[in-house]
Amino acid sequence: MAHDIHAHRILILDFGSQYTQLIARRVREIGVYCELHPWDMSDEDIRAFAPRGIILAGGPESVHEANSPRAPQAVFDLNVPVLGICYGMQTMAEQLGGKVEGSDLREFGYARVDVVGKSQLLAGIEDHVDADGVFGLDVWMSHGDKVTRLPEGFHILASTPSCPIAAMSDDTRHYYGVQFHPEVTHTKQGGRILSRFVLEISGCEALWTPANIVEDAVAAVRAQVGDANVLLGLSGGVDSSVVAALLHKAIGDQLTCVFVDNGLLRLHEGDQVMAMFAENMGVKVIRANAEEQFLSNLAGESDPEKKRKIIGRTFIDVFDAEASKLDNIQFLAQGTIYPDVIESAGAKSGKAHVIKSHHNVGGLPEEMNLKLVEPLRELFKDEVRKIGLELGLPYDMVYRHPFPGPGLGVRILGEVKKEYADLLRRADHIFIEELRKADWYHKTSQAFVVFQPVKSVGVVGDGRRYAWVVALRAVETVDFMTARWAHLPYELLETVSGRIINEIEGISRVTYDVSSKPPATIEWE
């Protein structure tokens, strides 16, 4: 490894904003490594992290309330550039001797700020220039409080009619505050502003690229694993597929994958996984055909939560049985990604090893005494996809819609039966095929069919028949926290419905789910 791609790094301190992970993703997109830590990170940890620049993120609290969070003193003692965003700007102002007050006028949503001062942060960055030569920026605001007195050494950089100090700067110390959110796409020049802070002001080099990340991860895996053997549960999902490709590149035949075919996968999915990894890439994959075991364990159970637990337990049983046939396995690989690390244990220690419950290998480590290998634990989902492409995985696989761990088990309402799973698989295949043909697959974030265990009357030729009902579901979302139902063209829905009813004996009616999240969840169970 010629260079340490973690050497140039930015520290982001989280004060509780819903946008904080977005800041980290934006910094990574610029090509610079960063980590997210809680606002009360200790001074010694901050010094040990040795950031080239620090970003104080937003948060829901009021700076002037008792016990509201403050940036650690080390932030201002390190002599590195600091950018405060929203709450981060307010706490910086307060801590450096300025004043913050509550305001009757909340600013929420789009705003235009006038750039009234000169500073390296915003120089040459604008959306408009008005007749008087004032530069303007279109930004996204979300605040009630505002800075009413600048700390010593600062000047006003930007303002709006209701917020005279919308941005402030002290170019001598390289301290900057912006009241708006540069990390959200609504702030049109946000990427350029963050880029300016990270690359030019903080002096970071853009070393964090997919090619470098792969090289670094391969070296790290080899260093951790040595000549030991590694076991991976391969599901065909994005995370486990990328882990498989990465480990195969790093350690070749020391990797063994177990692919559990639970009978609840998409049409031909098991064969596709085997073709991709075993045949094309030469990965050692053991395929456990466990459809009968899963279906017999699920028989008679209609409660969604219990179904999930049964599927999870059965997975562990099957995985364990296969793993115990293997000799000399020392490591268990997992597709843990950075958001899991952040959520688990508040990422307080930064060392939180958490096994994703939906990988369902919770029963393994204790008995087999395996050490964990988590090569993706520093990466966001969008980075994992880019790494997948870098490793040569096909685009369609890497950008495939999410599929739940329990598979079709939670898309068959009520009891799971083989007959239902077979019908659903075919209906789902038709829906996805038509979405791809009409160029709608990548415009939707998730699309699938739900099997409803109710029969409805249909007319076939001269006769009536009672057959099953299915619902189509397609949503658009940025973060899966909120989602709106996809407004698919009527012609497309008509084609899908016609094909499902005509090609699949046993389904007589197709409905389209027009519920958004909230209140409805994306999956039905």
Curated annotation (Swiss-Prot):
The keyword Cytoplasm does not apply. PROSITE patterns: GATASE_TYPE_1 (PS51273), GMPS_ATP_PPASE (PS51553). Residues 208-400 form the GMPS ATP-PPase domain. Homodimer. One of its GO terms (cellular component) is cytosol. It comes from the Bacteria. NCBIfam families: guaA_Cterm, guaA_Nterm, PRK00074.1. It catalyses: XMP + L-glutamine + ATP + H2O = GMP + L-glutamate + AMP + diphosphate + 2 H(+). The keyword ATP-binding applies. One of its GO terms (molecular function) is GMP synthase activity. The active site is at C86, H181, E183. This is GMP synthase [glutamine-hydrolyzing]. Catalyzes the synthesis of GMP from XMP. Pathway: Purine metabolism; GMP biosynthesis; GMP from XMP (L-Gln route): step 1/1. ATP binds at S235, G236, G237, V238, D239, S240, S241. It comes from Ectopseudomonas mendocina (strain ymp). Its EC number is 6.3.5.2. Residues 9-207 form the Glutamine amidotransferase type-1 domain. Keywords: ATP-binding, Glutamine amidotransferase, GMP biosynthesis, Ligase, Nucleotide-binding, Purine biosynthesis. It holds the Pfam family NAD_synthase.
